[in-house]
Amino acid sequence: SSDVCSSDLVKVVCNELKQKGNELVIDAVITVDGSRIKSRENLSLTPVLESASQKEGLPSILLNGRISQKVYDREIALNNLQDEPRFLVVQAGKSENVINYKTVIPFEPWMKDARFVLIPNMCGCGKEEQGALLVMADKVLTRPDKRYEVQPTLAYISPEAETVKHRAEVGTAYLDFQVGKYAILPDFRNNVVELAKIDNTVSTVVNDKNITLEGIILKGFASPEGSYKSNTVLAGNRVKALAEYIRKKHDFKPELFTLDNGSEDWEGLKAKVEADRSVPSREAVLAIINSNDEPDKKDARLAALDGGAPYRYVLKNIYPSLRRSDYRVAYQVRFFTVEEGREIIKTRPQQLSLSEMFAVANSYEIGSKEYNEVFEIAVRMYSDDPVANLNAANIALSKNDLDAARTYLAKAGNSPEAIHARGVLNLLDGNLDEAGKLLEQAKAAGVKEAAANLDELRKKEADNQLFDSFE
């Protein structure tokens, strides 16, 4: 009768149907009411994985009635039976038969869209009857194709405004003088080039309508050969002559200038000898320079060293570069509107304060090319400023450039926002425990963006757990 394969004959529960690495793990429990299988009948149960495009039958279960089992055993003994692959062949018990169907098969890509069904077949008295198909599982649990990608939220800091924007242009002029003289001869040797350097610097500042000149600081140095006293007088007179030259050329007031006499430049000599491996008897030369002798005694000892070879070398190769004037043109820059700042940043970024740059950045869309560029310029101009470094780190994090972010964060200080950015760095880098600690710390310190990143952290942890469960 047709009720033999009704669902109360066979009940199924699927515990697991899941991809693990390259395998498919199957774990189902099939329960059969044995009282419904007559002595001369048998019930075959075939598990099948089926997708729209493909199906694969798995080894089946055969439950025999009492006489059917004897027939089966005899056929096997006589080697007459070419049976299909069986998971289990057993004589059906009179009551409930519980079969734990556990197996592992190679996982194939088509299986990720498959369902798992059981097809019952009742056989006996020369007729066969297929029962209603039973669905054991709607789908195979498979590893997702894509990992969860963290979408960070970043916390930028607006910098403190500068009250006065002090800036300076600095340089060094190597002027040639006639021996023992201090008059400036513009056409003498290379002086035309050296004076042009100073003139250009001063003119650039004077002609810029955004700038107020604050002062010019000049410091003159002499090389150490000869008497310290006369060299000091000479260095002083030469720097005065340079100040007078600039003053006349640009029609400045004398009080604009601050003059400093560096006298004999032993510090400069030491640095240059340390940097030049070709100096004869270099260690001995350095020992004299570093000694506590009076300058004139050092000079005499250098001249006498090793028959004068080291002295001749430094006179020719090092001393000319010690005779110089360092100059610093100090000025003050006015404040700019955002519109002006957008233009100035392209040509003279050093005239903008950090807070002006921040205002310029925020006039663009967050994350736009222009927005990012401003923060990158800011950190170039203010390379040691913690705020500039923090904001540049955020830009790097938004582009997933973790190495750059790490470099900037090393100089970003320990503000709550910097701690927050380090949390985001660890989150993007997969160090979730460390990220959690830092983000919680930032949240406690009042960084409101931390909450969104802690949500991302939880999503990433869940994704990791899910992925690991398929390994």
Segments from the language model and where they lie:
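N-terminal targeting segments with Sec-dependent signals, encompassing both cleavable signal peptides
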Residues: S1-E471
